[in-house]
Regions:
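Alpha-helical transmembrane segments of integral membrane proteins
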Residues: 1-22, 263-268, 296-323, 327, ...
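Mid-to-C-terminal secondary-structure elements
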Residues: 99, 112-136, 145-276, 349, ...
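N-terminal membrane-entry
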Residues: 267-285, 370-374
């Protein structure tokens, strides 16, 4: 530790002395580490960060499955049996999403509606910031129509007016009474984009035959595990219950089972492979950058061969030379990481401002503590990775040869071989990336050129939201 500060000062002097090399290395590191940090911030927000609900690891997603359809919506009658016979969940709720049209006040507006059972918010552990949630007596056919507002819709349509409770909203031609407003921070993740929340069973009188066993009206379920119950045990029990229903109702349930997976996994499983692929791709780019920087440092080490030999002659041991060289590499890497953080911060803000329905939680991307720790660890590993070969090269300085031959000849052979190996590795990694990019480009080209069976020229599409009661 006594020599750490002198080593850092010496490293900074050497970096100033080789300004061209330093600038190239810093820019290379900034791009490599910045890209890795930016992509990891997305991976962290989408895949790693827990859902913003109490004990979210106990929340699971439930669906039905068959040999033909591995993940399908749930029959309402089956859901009733699941909820009444299971022993592994302390709460279970069903829900579905659709679009409704708001009329009656101001301009008509198409809204995203979540229809759910009364157990939905208690199961999640979410409480409204105004009013209350749907009561059990309101969660049945013939009950009064009530609605909760999402924070975004409340802000956009009512200017966060606290007197919104009790107002009437006309949704698809039916009057609903506003009973509550949900907090924005609790709705991040799964249902942040939902505008209004209504009773699912209240809609049963509008579903007709869709409410019968064997019908699947786009409804799914989620549940909260009891304390101490593993997801494996819950999965086994749900399959047992589904098997019993298949025997009891063979006409509608034969060949169907139940699927139980963590709620977060269900939400992000479609985007996990492409995000991890992107993380691997930018990791390969950083490896190539490390190879480039290692080559630069090896070339500079050849020029410093006589200096290193003299230091050995004055008593510097191998470990001392390695430590000095690694310190210089780590200082360079940390400086490059600082620049990379600036780039990553700019990219992260761009990601957070985007909204893609196919990438959930993308707007939650941020430079939090996990991302900063990742960047710090990555910068240290990067510095060690591209600095180890130049550090080992420093121990090869031969005192007698350097003094007799003027300094550089003895280092050329070993250094040249190492640099050739690095160049070969860089080319190999570059070919892997180019091949992957080429395959993806070809797939996109074929997809765009695929024959849809009709001529799409001058053809437009339109969608209409029709009320369930009338259609």
């Amino acid at each position: 530790m006594e020599t750490l500060l002198p080593d850092i000062r010496y490293a900074l002097r050497m970096l100033r002395k080789s300004r061209g090399l330093t600038i190239v290395a810093l820019l290379t590191l900034a791009l490599g580490i910045g890209a890795n940090t930016a992509i990891f911030s997305v991976v962290n927000a989408v895949l790693l960060r827990p859902l913003p609900y109490s004990d979210s690891e106990r929340l699971v997603f439930l669906s039905e499955s068959s040999q033909q359809i591995p993940d399908m919506s749930i029959s309402m009658a089956n859901f009733d049996d699941w909820r009444s016979t299971n022993t592994v969940f302390e709460g279970m709720a069903a829900y579905r999403t659709q679009n409704v049209v708001l009329t009656g006040t101001g301009e008509p507006e198409r809204l995203r509606e979540r229809q759910m059972t009364a157990s939905f918010f208690p199961t999640l552990g979410v409480r409204p910031i105004l009013g209350r949630v749907i009561a059990q007596e309101e969660d049945k056919v013939g009950a009064e129509r009530v609605v909760l507002l999402g924070d975004g819709f409340w802000t956009r349509r009512f200017g966060r007016d606290p007197n919104v409770l009790g107002r009437k909203l006309i949704l698809d031609g039916e009057a609903y009474t506003v009973i509550g407003v949900l907090p924005n921070q609790e709705m991040h993740g799964l249902w942040r984009r939902t505008d209004v929340f209504t009773s699912l069973w209240r809609q049963e009188d509008q579903m007709g035959g869709a409410a019968r066993r064997g019908e699947h009206p786009g409804m799914y379920a989620m549940a909260r595990l009891k304390s101490g119950i593993s997801i494996e045990k819950a999965r086994a029990e749900m399959k047992r219950i589904a098997g019993g229903l298949a025997q009891k109702y063979p006409d509608t349930n034969r060949g169907t089972s139940a699927e139980t997976i963590p709620l977060l996994q269900a939400y992000v499983e479609d985007v996990r492979p492409p995000l991890l692929f992107l993380l691997v791709a930018v990791g390969l780019v950083l490896l190539i950058a490390c190879g480039n920087i290692a080559n630069l440092l090896l070339a500079r080490g050849t020029q410093r061969y006589r200096e290193l030999a003299v230091r050995r002659a004055l008593g510097a041991g191998n470990w001392r030379l390695i430590r000095q060289s690694l310190t210089e590499s780590l200082v360079l890497s940390l400086l490059g990481s600082a620049l990379g953080l600036l780039l990553a911060g700019w990219l992260t803000k761009g990601f957070a401002s985007l909204y893609y329905a196919s990438v959930p939680r993308l707007d939650e991307t941020s430079m939090d503590r996990t991302v900063l720790l990742f960047t710090l660890g990555l910068s240290i590993l990067t510095g060690l990775f591209f600095g180890i070969l130049p550090a080992l090269q420093a121990t090869r300085a031969d005192v007698h040869q350097a003094l007799q031959e003027g300094g550089r000849t003895g280092a050329v052979g070993a250094s040249g071989r190492l640099r050739n190996i690095l160049i070969t590795a860089e080319v190999a990694l570059s070919l892997v990336l180019l091949a992957g990019a080429g395959l993806m480009s070809k797939s996109l080209y074929l997809l765009l050129r695929a024959d849809g069976g009709f001529n799409p020229a001058h053809v437009l599409t339109a969608s209409f939201s029709l009320p369930d009661a009338a259609y």
